[in-house]
UniProtKB/Swiss-Prot annotation:
Listed Pfam families: F-box, FBA_1
Name by which UniProt lists this protein: F-box protein At1g66490
Domain of life: Eukaryota
InterPro entries: A_thaliana_F-box (IPR050233), F-box-assoc_dom_typ1 (IPR006527), F-box-assoc_interact_dom (IPR017451), F-box-like_dom_sf (IPR036047), F-box_dom (IPR001810)
Domain F-box: 1-46
Length: 370
């Protein structure tokens, strides 16, 4: 009698390519062959397509975005998006990614959870005391020690008071840190176990300097201020956001007040040193109003295709539905828009998008057990 382990490898690979990222843990238990092929499939695909997570209306969605057929309309694969059901009963407020693990922070005083989407394991993070209960104003960073990959969570407890503590996943223990970056920290991303933040000087406009600052989870300290390839004026019409490039480089998007969008990528980055290269510069005033009119953007880049895929932080609407749009932007004014994540405008959904909960994070699967 034939079994599923007898199926041709090419057929199994085709099946696995259609399985949502969060369902692969069930596939892995099917048989040894499927387990091995799922690892090859998923780790190989991360080099060919964008795998990531997007947060919309306090829900988490896995997303696949393949640019392989970009130059040939008939071969272009539309992005797929699927809601993550494992966390459906809780409203997710923030998500932080570090090399295959997700730190999910919920609305209210619920404990955060670290989740491995590939293996399916979870670990809940208990506060040290009632005084340390989680607040909406708390900020987080997620990283690990260099030598043993011991994962840690940094929290800015009521960050405007300059109170910082750190959680060690191995020992399940919190401790207070005597650190002070002496700056206004905005957004951050994890790269090679460290977290790099876009930050501004605590000073009055218009002489506010902006820069990067790194938190090293091995030393448990903030590093020196690192230069950016631009200077933002701090105007409401400006926007700065960070993104990782295959967990190897850092990219920064800067939208100027005059509508010019610039994207830079690091050629070298360490806690005390950074070098930048210009990746893309476009004038958004020549683009459709629905894109130009959006102030905030989230993005990832494809170095091989030399394009940026940019998402607005709010949906677009029709009489019947709402949907998200990805804009593929290249040099010479190249622009392609792709719709996905359609939601009907009925009483059940009630136009349920929430622009404050939009998040985009690339994903590389992890074999870390929780």
């Amino acid at each position: 009698m034939r079994t599923i382990s007898d199926l041709p490898v090419a057929l199994v690979e085709e099946i696995l390519s259609r399985v949502p990222l969060t369902s692969l843990s069930a596939v892995r238990s099917t048989c040894k062959t499927w387990n091995a092929l799922s690892k090859t499939q998923i780790f190989g695909k991360t080099r060919q397509q964008f795998l990531g997570f997007m947060m919309i209306d306090f829900g988490l969605y896995s997303i696949k975005f393949d640019l392989q057929g970009l130059n040939y309309e008939s071969d272009f694969v539309e992005p797929s998006i699927k809601r993550v059901s494992i966390l459906d009963q809780l409203d997710i407020f923030k998500v932080f990614h570090c090399e295959g693990l997700l730190l999910c922070v919920f609305r209210g005083n619920r404990w955060p959870v670290v989740w491995n989407p590939y293996l399916g394991g979870t670990g809940w993070i208990q506060p040290i005391s009632d005084f340390h209960k989680y607040q909406v104003s708390d900020k987080f960073a997620f990283g690990y020690e260099n030598k043993n990959r011991n994962y840690k969570i940094l929290r800015f407890l009521r960050y405007f008071f300059g109170f910082y503590d750190i959680y060690d996943l191995n020992s399940s223990a919190w401790k207070v840190l005597d650190v002070n970056p002496d700056c206004d920290i905005k957004c951050g991303v994890s790269l090679k176990g460290k977290t790099y933040f876009f930050a501004k000087e605590i000073a009055k406009a218009p002489n506010v300097k902006d820069f990067l600052v790194c938190f090293d989870f091995t030393a448990e300290r903030f590093g020196p201020r690192l230069p950016l390839p631009f200077h933002s004026c701090g105007l409401f019409s400006e926007h700065v956001t960070l993104s990782c490039v295959r967990d190897e480089h850092l990219a920064v998007l800067y939208r100027r007040y005059n509508g010019v969008m610039e994207i830079y990528i690091t050629t070298k980055i360490e806690p005390n040193e950074v070098f930048w290269s210009n990746f893309l510069k476009v004038d958004l005033t020549t683009f459709p109003d629905r894109f130009y009119g959006s102030r905030s953007h989230y993005f990832f880049i494809d170095e091989e295709k030399k394009v940026a895929v940019v998402f607005k932080n709010e949906p677009e609407w029709t009489m019947d539905c709402s949907y998200q749009t990805a804009y593929i932007i290249g040099k010479g004014g190249y622009l392609k828009s792709v719709k996905f994540g359609e939601t009907p405008n009925d009483r059940k959904h009630n136009n349920a998008w929430n622009i404050n909960s939009f998040m985009l994070s690339s994903y590389v699967p992890s074999l870390v057990q929780l």
